[in-house]
């Protein structure tokens, strides 16, 4: 192939960027001719137009031409050149004005002509017409097919002569890839003439002229399109029609190596076509750009529909769509009426690099929507953004291909029926669609869960059993076989009559029963059967065979002389009925604390006792209900006969050495053991053991009682065949010969059968009590959700807590979790409304707090703490989340996520009485504190059976250092006393030593010092404490029966925001170190009471404990020795 200008390729690199092209369409009054003004964007293009001006004039008829501005539109082109994967032969060479998206159109020759005039506008003005339909088998760019009615002029010379219509070529528009061998001006005259068309009569008004002109264009387009599919050779269409062919534009993605705007598809049907080709000069580029400008000018009033179709056709821009589709859609709308012929259709074909093509069907009903037949994989990304807009429009077409579209359907559409969509709209629609899909999936979840086999609770199981009874398949089969044999076999008449009578009688009986039986009778039997099976299902709770832990022991207990420093630490192991007490070489802390380290001790001795027939009770005898589980009062164990047991223990010791507990090392206790055994053989041996926390004390007491009844229950069960174990204060248990304590709840069998098989008790109340205790695990099994779930349901449980749960599994929204506890928070909030607002309750709380404050031990020169101000805030604690309850050997556990933001505020006041300095501290201590043997404690016994507050739970009387002799206790603010050999703390001894010196006494006698001491003594010390926030996991525990306590404490130290503002008189102390120290100490005191293993307790009136006088087995009705025999 040749070109007119050989150095065109070199010029293109130096050419300036084309300016924004403009279009001016002029039409004569006679409407026979149309004048379109265009020019190149540079000087070279103007010279080129002057060169061909003479050919324009020759081709014009004598018809008059009237210049009229028809339309104008600015378009800013964005030329983009991609990488050419095909090689250098297809490298992109762009000329000025060449950044267009269409190829030259094949237009028929018409009798009328159109005159092209030079426009004075310097901007590039390009003519655009409806382009040619893409060849189905060609790639997206390549040489353009020419016909006798198509011509073009070229400005580029190239050595390449072979056509580039092969599908393997890169889809890039180059100057050499779209040229022909024609270099004369005659073909260009045919192109100019083909722009002419026959129009309707001139008398039609201006809007009508638009519609008639477009109608003719649409008709000629549809007719010629159908012919073009069957005829691949050049032809001369009728002069009365303007034959237009559609072709695909903007379908190439920008990553295919070509410009999405400048890469038209080749219309060649075969690379072996020998017809003449034409070159692509800059003039052709201007013409192509002008064609597109004209199409956009025409469809501007209907730009919304064009954007929708263009986006559907695979463009990356909302406005980018093929000129053929956009022009035709707007032309159809301009017609203003429905086309009666449904044969008119438009076809927009997609031709990818593999040459995939789509056919068209001209017989499409107007009501049918286009359907997609395929979708290339390279446009998957576009599909997601286009799918939502297509669904909203009711179109089910491919994101790349508008395969079939009825012309009449497009014409019937009004412009208000279409909405303006942009790229961001598609994203929003996609999100909205996903939400709709999620909402549509919600009703399906219950069905899916039901099909997957949800584990139903007892009521659901009963309903399912009633609604879905099992079919008696075998019975029905046998009955059908009998009927078949009866009808087939030649039976005698009397046999047939017998069978017939039996059958009729059976059916009559069934009908009578069905009519006269109440409808709920069958359902009742089903419910009874299911409930019976449900009741016998018990919890699988296994108690540890060995209960071990630290306790405090005292040899002799006297409430009037007792002090915590008189106790020593022991490690206790309870295995069956055997109790082992291991004494360490040094004491550990007398009270448990959160996250305490493992003590490093060595055991120096060990005592072994048999608790069989022992008497277990609490001392003092008359403990107030609120002090039953106070750790300051011990558990008393009056041991039974120990002679046989100790001889057996010695034999076991000789055969196998006794290992020390896990917390210690090997203990050298073998030599003194015979002496200890002799001592323990005495019947009057009594042990006093203190729990380190109140909750541990209750647990130890319950287990001691069970161990004391272990052997007696074995004897009873072995002596009486089928006999039942005696009453236990907790739950039923069966014993093993080894003496290990085994819980009956560990068996999967229920206790209902055992109750039915037991002989009747003499006392009805006792049997009722027995049955209640036996059914404890069964009763709790109905109250606590089952641990086991079906495999289909188990992932759902983990979805609430695990972030890695599968997305397809239904998840509980956070709002639902909050709603589950909303009713509890609302109920508590309403109940405590008056509690927060009424003065009666604030005074009651103030009194309770004051009773606690009065028991705090302060230095002897300080007055008592008083509560001067209390503000309980405006809110009560809220439950943020309630975890699933569970039951273990310690009872029922419920974990609650709590939060408090109520601004609880209280102000404490005290004074320092410096006049007491230098006086005998023992005398002052006798008035306030509890000191030990030397001092008499007349109130100690009185406090035991009263509801008056005892010493603070956070008091330091039990907080001494882990020394062998129980050394000096740690000093805490406001907690001074005599401990560890009845010695005061080091600081107090140092202060006493200074104040008793003669120099200090002389100094205090001076008037100035006396005056200052009086001023300081009269100055109040104020401390305002505000609890702003408290948040943590609160554990609520209810021990197994019999108990009347509910224990609560935080699993770990909660997040507490305390603000302490100390004042010295009217002056507020603002030292950061002082306030931080006070806040830290307050948090430590809070942990000593409310952080596990320390738990606070409240007693519930409706619950009964072993010490409850209302109980049939109350231990307080009789003296302690006899009370131990009662369960």
From Swiss-Prot:
Biased composition, class Acidic residues, residue ranges: 947-962
Instruction: List residues of the SMP-LTD domain.
Output: 816-1101
Q: Which keywords annotate this record?
A: Endoplasmic reticulum, Glycoprotein, Lipid transport, Lipid-binding, Membrane, Nucleus, Phosphoprotein, Transmembrane, Transmembrane helix, Transport
CDD domains per the UniProt record, alphabetical: SMP_TEX2 (cd21675)
What PROSITE patterns does the record tag this protein with? SMP
GO molecular-function terms, A-Z: lipid binding
How this chain sits in the membrane, per its record, is:
Multi-pass membrane protein
Disulfide links within the chain: none
Q: Where in the cell is it found?
A: Endoplasmic reticulum membrane; Nucleus membrane
Modified residues annotated as Phosphoserine in this record: 196, 265-266, 270, 295, 732, 738, 744, 748, 751, 798, 815
Provide the GO biological process annotations. lipid transport; signal transduction; sphingolipid metabolic process
- In this chain, composition skew of type Low complexity spans 133-187
Q: Which residues cross the membrane?
A: 475-495, 497-517
The answer, when asked if Transmembrane is one of the entry's keywords, is yes
Residues found modified as Phosphothreonine: 262
**Cellular component annotations (GO), alphabetically ordered:** endoplasmic reticulum; endoplasmic reticulum membrane; membrane; nuclear membrane
State whether keyword Phosphoprotein applies.
yes
UniProt-annotated glycosylation sites, renumbered to this chain: 330
Q: Where is the composition biased (Basic and acidic residues)?
A: 366-382, 650-670
Function comment: During endoplasmic reticulum (ER) stress or when cellular ceramide levels increase, may induce contacts between the ER and medial-Golgi complex to facilitate non-vesicular transport of ceramides from the ER to the Golgi complex where they are converted to complex sphingolipids, preventing toxic ceramide accumulation.
Let me see what the UniProt entry remarks about domains: The SMP-LTD domain is a barrel-like domain that can bind various types of glycerophospholipids in its interior and mediate their transfer between two adjacent bilayers.
Name of the protein described by the UniProt record: Testis-expressed protein 2
Report the source organism.
Homo sapiens
Gene assigned in the entry:
TEX2
């Amino acid at each position: 192939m040749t070109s007119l200008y050989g150095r065109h390729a070199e010029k293109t690199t130096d050419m300036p960027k084309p300016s924004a092209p403009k279009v001016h369409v002029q039409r004569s009054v006679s409407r026979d001719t149309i004048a379109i003004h265009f020019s190149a964007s540079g000087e070279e293009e103007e010279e080129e137009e002057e060169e061909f001006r003479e050919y324009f004039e020759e081709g014009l008829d004598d018809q008059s031409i009237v210049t009229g501005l028809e339309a104008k539109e600015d378009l800013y082109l964005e030329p983009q050149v991609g990488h050419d994967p095909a090689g250098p032969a297809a490298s992109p060479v762009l000329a000025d004005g060449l950044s267009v998206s269409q190829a030259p159109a094949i237009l028929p020759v018409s009798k009328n002509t159109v005159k092209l005039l030079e426009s004075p506008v310097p901007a590039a003005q390009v003519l655009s017409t409806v382009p040619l339909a893409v060849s189905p088998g060609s790639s997206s760019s390549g040489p353009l097919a020419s016909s006798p009615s198509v011509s073009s002029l070229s400005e580029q010379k190239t050595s390449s002569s072979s056509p580039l219509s092969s599908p393997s070529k890169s889809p890039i528009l180059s100057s050499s890839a779209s040229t022909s061998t024609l270099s004369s001006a005659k073909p260009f005259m045919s192109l100019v003439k083909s722009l002419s068309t026959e129009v309707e009569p001139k008398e039609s008004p201006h809007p009508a002229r638009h519609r008639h002109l477009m109608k003719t264009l649409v008709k000629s387009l549809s007719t010629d399109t159908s012919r073009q599919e069957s005829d691949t050779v050049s032809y001369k269409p009728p002069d009365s029609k303007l034959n237009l062919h559609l072709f695909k534009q903007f379908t190439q993605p920008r990553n295919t190596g070509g410009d999405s705007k400048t890469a038209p598809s080749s219309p060649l049907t075969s690379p072996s076509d020998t017809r003449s080709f034409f070159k692509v000069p800059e003039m052709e580029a201007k013409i192509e750009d002008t064609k597109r400008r004209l199409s956009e000018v025409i469809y501007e009033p209907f730009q919304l529909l064009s954007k929708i179709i263009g986006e559907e056709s695979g463009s990356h821009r909302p406005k980018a769509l093929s000129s053929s589709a956009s022009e035709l859609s707007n032309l159809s709308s301009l017609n203003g009426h429905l086309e009666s012929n449904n044969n008119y259709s438009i076809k927009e074909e997609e031709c990818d690099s593999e040459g995939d093509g789509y056919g068209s069907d001209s017989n499409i009903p107007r009501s049918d929507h286009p359907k997609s037949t395929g979708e290339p994989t390279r446009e998957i990304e576009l599909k997601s953004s286009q799918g939502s807009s297509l669904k909203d429009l009711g179109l089910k077409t491919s994101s790349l291909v508008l395969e079939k579209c009825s012309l009449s359907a497009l014409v019937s559409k009004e412009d208000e029926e279409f909405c303006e969509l942009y790229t961001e709209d598609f994203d929003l629609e996609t999100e909205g669609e996903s939400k709709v899909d999620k909402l549509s999936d919600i009703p399906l979840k219950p069905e899916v869960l039901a099909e997957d086999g949800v584990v139903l609770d007892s009521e659901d199981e009963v309903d399912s059993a009633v609604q879905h009874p099992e079919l008696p398949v075998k019975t029905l089969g046998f009955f059908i076989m009998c009927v078949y044999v009866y009808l087939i076999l030649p039976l005698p008449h009397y046999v047939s009559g017998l069978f017939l009578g039996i059958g009729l009688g059976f059916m009559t009986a069934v009908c009578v029963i069905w009519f006269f039986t109440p409808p709920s009778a069958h359902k009742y039997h089903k419910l009874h059967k299911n409930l019976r099976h449900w009741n016998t299902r018990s919890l699988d709770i296994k108690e540890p065979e060995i209960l071990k832990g630290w306790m405090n022991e005292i040899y002799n207990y006297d409430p009037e002389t007792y002090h915590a420093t008189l106790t020593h630490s022991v490690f206790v192991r309870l295995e069956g009925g055997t109790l082992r007490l291991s004494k360490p070489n040094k004491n550990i802390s007398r009270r448990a604390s959160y996250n305490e380290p493992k003590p490093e001790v060595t055991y120096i001795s060990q005592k072994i006792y048999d608790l069989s027939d022992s008497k277990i009770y609490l001392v003092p005898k008359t403990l107030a209900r609120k002090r039953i589980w106070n750790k300051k009062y011990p558990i008393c164990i009056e041991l039974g006969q120990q002679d046989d047991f100790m001889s057996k223990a010695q034999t076991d010791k000789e055969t196998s050495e006794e290992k020390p507990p896990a917390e210690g090392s090997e203990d050298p206790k073998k030599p003194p053991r015979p002496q200890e055994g002799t001592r323990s053989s005495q019947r009057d041996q009594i042990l006093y053991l203190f729990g380190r926390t109140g909750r541990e004390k209750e647990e130890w007491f319950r287990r001691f009682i069970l161990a004391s009844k272990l052997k007696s229950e074995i004897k009873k069960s072995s002596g009486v065949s089928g006999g039942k174990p005696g009453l236990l204060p907790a739950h039923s248990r069966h014993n093993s010969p080894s003496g290990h304590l085994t819980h009956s709840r560990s068996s999967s069998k229920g206790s209902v059968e055992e109750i039915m098989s037991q002989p009747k008790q003499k006392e009805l109340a006792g049997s009722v009590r027995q049955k209640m205790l036996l059914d404890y695990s069964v009763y709790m099994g109905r109250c606590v959700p089952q641990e086991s779930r079906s495999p289909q349901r188990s992932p759902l449980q983990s979805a609430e807590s695990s972030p890695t749960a599968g997305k397809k599994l239904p998840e509980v929204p956070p709002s639902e979790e909050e709603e589950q506890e909303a009713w509890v928070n609302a109920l508590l909030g309403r109940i405590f409304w008056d509690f927060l607002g009424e003065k009666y309750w604030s005074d009651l709380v103030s009194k309770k707090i004051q009773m606690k404050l009065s028991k705090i031990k302060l230095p002897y020169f300080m007055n008592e703490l008083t509560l001067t101000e209390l503000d309980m805030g405006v809110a009560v604690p809220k439950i943020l989340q309630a975890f699933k309850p569970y039951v273990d050997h310690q009872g029922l556990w419920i974990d609650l996520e709590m939060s408090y933001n109520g601004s609880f505020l209280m102000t404490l006041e005290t004074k320092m009485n410096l006049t007491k300095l230098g006086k005998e501290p023992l005398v002052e201590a006798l008035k306030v504190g509890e000191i030990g043997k030397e001092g008499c404690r007349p109130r100690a016994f009185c406090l035991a059976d009263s509801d008056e507050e005892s010493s603070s739970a956070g008091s330091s009387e039990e907080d001494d250092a882990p020394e062998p002799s129980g050394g000096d206790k740690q000093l805490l603010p406001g907690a001074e006393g005599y401990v560890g050999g009845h010695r005061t703390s080091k600081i107090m001894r140092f202060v006493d030593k200074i104040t008793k010196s003669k120099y200090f006494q002389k100094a205090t006698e001076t008037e100035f010092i006396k005056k200052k001491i009086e001023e300081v003594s009269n100055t109040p010390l104020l401390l305002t404490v505000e609890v702003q926030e408290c948040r943590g996991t609160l554990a609520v525990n209810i021990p197994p029966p019999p108990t009347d306590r509910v224990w609560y404490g935080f699993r770990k130290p909660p997040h507490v925001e305390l603000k302490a503002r100390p004042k010295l008189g009217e002056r507020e102390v603002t030292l950061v170190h002082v306030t931080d120290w006070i806040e830290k100490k307050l948090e430590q005191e809070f942990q000593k009471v409310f952080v596990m293993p320390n738990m606070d307790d409240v007693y519930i009136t409706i619950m009964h404990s072993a010490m409850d006088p209302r109980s049939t087995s109350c231990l307080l009705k009789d003296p302690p020795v006899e009370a131990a025999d009662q369960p």
